[in-house]
Amino acid sequence: MSLLMISENVKLAREYALLGNYDSAMVYYQGVLDQMNKYLYSVKDTYLQQKWQQVWQEINVEAKHVKDIMKTLESFKLDSTPLKAAQHDLPASEGEVWSMPVPVERRPSPGPRKRQSSQYSDPKSHGNRPSTTVRVHRSSAQNVHNDRGKAVRCREKKEQNKGREEKNKSPAAVTEPETNKFDSTGYDKDLVEALERDIISQNPNVRWDDIADLVEAKKLLKEAVVLPMWMPEFFKGIRRPWKGVLMVGPPGTGKTLLAKAVATECKTTFFNVSSSTLTSKYRGESEKLVRLLFEMARFYSPATIFIDEIDSICSRRGTSEEHEASRRVKAELLVQMDGVGGTSENDDPSKMVMVLAATNFPWDIDEALRRRLEKRIYIPLPSAKGREELLRISLRELELADDVDLASIAENMEGYSGADITNVCRDASLMAMRRRIEGLTPEEIRNLSKEEMHMPTTMEDFEMALKKVSKSVSAADIERYEKWIFEFGSC
């Protein structure tokens, strides 16, 4: 706790008190007194303790003065209420109201007018004066009754609205099943809400059939996530499910797509986490986020935590460029992952939490994290058969010309990643549109019909697209990945 914060809060409290904002001043005074109490526990020197106690007493006296001012102001407000209370306490019977002339006696007319009226006015005018008092009483009584009537009407309207809301809510409460809510006691509400936003509740709608090739990777993910829920009695002891899977490979090979398929097909709670989710500018908050993430995953188990680009969160420790804050986050992540297995000999495998990670830089990952990610699989570039299958998946919504040969196109795409093949298909599908609108004005383009725009994609379009789109992964990169997976892989 900084002394600068205490001094700033004292300044703010005094400024609010001078400006007449006593409620805010009391809040700051109370906060300062609490902060000073905490600070006094940390002070070991007796002389300093005495000094701080004197300061505390002085500020406490100031706070009491502000309290007294607030009480005085409240008493002014309360002094005006008896009149209103007396008005509301008037009986409902009109005969009793007329028999109370006390308010009129408190408001006499000025002296000179009294003399004039007593000297020059006739007795009829004196006889008329009680009628004015009656009018005053009648008007005041009518106001009281009107106020009461309005209050009763407002209450009735509120009750009717509440009843309607309950009726509207009741069908939803019956139809929607009750879902367990994570108990956020002890954690910041904003942190819990931020992590709950990262839970993919809506299906990404990516099926296993939407992913071409990668048979081994799909088989491993099904074994790690799906089978333990189908056969919980089998996956116990030494057969416990894998608690960590690392997908390694060049960019654009389908690592994130596999994670989306896991979220769609495996029916587990899926946390999509990135480095921005687990980092904070406040000291110690990043570690809390990591711990909270795994506690929420255990609560919503069976769960899968997908950490994309994990090298940005848990790179190698002990380097000169490493910051203390990032080191603490890595330590907390490693501790939570080691205790996140949830599938020891006596635990239920259907309540597991699995960490699914993806990276393009496996050589930068810390050794301890590499040990915790028990299965390390290589996601390679698609084979010739995989490229042809990927072409069919990408072009299934397009109309193709009769001369299109997908097998020959796949052969010409050797070394292309899955993302590169998708880009080629997208570029080829736009070729016919480009030819059709060439030389036309914007008005003519707007007047084109849908039939004129949807023309079949030809083999020539693919050849032109292949000339424009080059592969994004070099042979040297592939060799580096294969060397790492040969040394550290666990398929």
UniProtKB/Swiss-Prot annotation:
Its EC number is 5.6.1.1. Changing K255A: Abolishes ATP dependent microtubule severing activity and localization to spindle poles. Residues 1-75 are annotated as: Interaction with dynein and NDEL1. The keyword Nucleotide-binding applies. Changing D308N: Abolishes ATP dependent microtubule severing activity and localization to spindle poles. Residues 1-185 are annotated as: Interaction with microtubules. Phosphorylation by DYRK2 triggers ubiquitination and subsequent degradation. Ubiquitinated by the BCR(KLHL42) E3 ubiquitin ligase complex, leading to its proteasomal degradation. Ubiquitinated by the EDVP E3 ligase complex and subsequently targeted for proteasomal degradation. ATPase activity is stimulated by microtubules, which promote homooligomerization. ATP-dependent microtubule severing is stimulated by interaction with KATNB1. ATP binds at G249, P250, P251, G252, T253, G254, K255, T256. Pfam families: AAA, AAA_lid_3, KATNA1_MIT, Vps4_C. One of its GO terms (biological process) is microtubule severing. SUPFAM superfamilies: P-loop containing nucleoside triphosphate hydrolases (SSF52540). It catalyses: n ATP + n H2O + a microtubule = n ADP + n phosphate + (n+1) alpha/beta tubulin heterodimers. GO terms for cellular component: centrosome; cytoplasm; katanin complex; microtubule; microtubule cytoskeleton; midbody; mitotic spindle pole; spindle. Residues 145-169 have a biased composition (Basic and acidic residues). Its main location: cytoplasm. Residues 87-185 are annotated as: Disordered. InterPro entries: AAA+_ATPase, AAA_lid_3, ATPase_AAA_core, ATPase_AAA_CS, KATNA1, KATNA1_MIT, KTNA1_AAA_dom, MT-severing_AAA_ATPase. Keywords: ATP-binding, Cell cycle, Cell division, Cytoplasm, Cytoskeleton, Isomerase, Microtubule, Mitosis, Nucleotide-binding, Phosphoprotein, Ubl conjugation. The modification Phosphoserine is found at S42, S109, S170. Gene3D superfamilies: 1.10.8.60, P-loop containing nucleotide triphosphate hydrolases, Phosphotransferase system, lactose/cellobiose-type IIA subunit. Residues 1-29 are annotated as: Interaction with KATNB1. Belongs to the AAA ATPase family. Katanin p60 subunit A1 subfamily. The N-terminus is sufficient for interaction with microtubules, although high affinity binding to microtubules also requires an intact C-terminal domain and ATP, which promotes oligomerization. Can homooligomerize into hexameric rings, which may be promoted by interaction with microtubules. Interacts with KATNB1, which may serve as a targeting subunit. Interacts with ASPM; the katanin complex formation KATNA1:KATNB1 is required for the association of ASPM. Interacts with dynein and NDEL1. Associates with the E3 ligase complex containing DYRK2, EDD/UBR5, DDB1 and DCAF1 proteins (EDVP complex). Interacts with KLHL42 (via the kelch domains). Interacts with CUL3; the interaction is enhanced by KLHL42. Interacts with KATNB1 and KATNBL1. This is Katanin p60 ATPase-containing subunit A1.
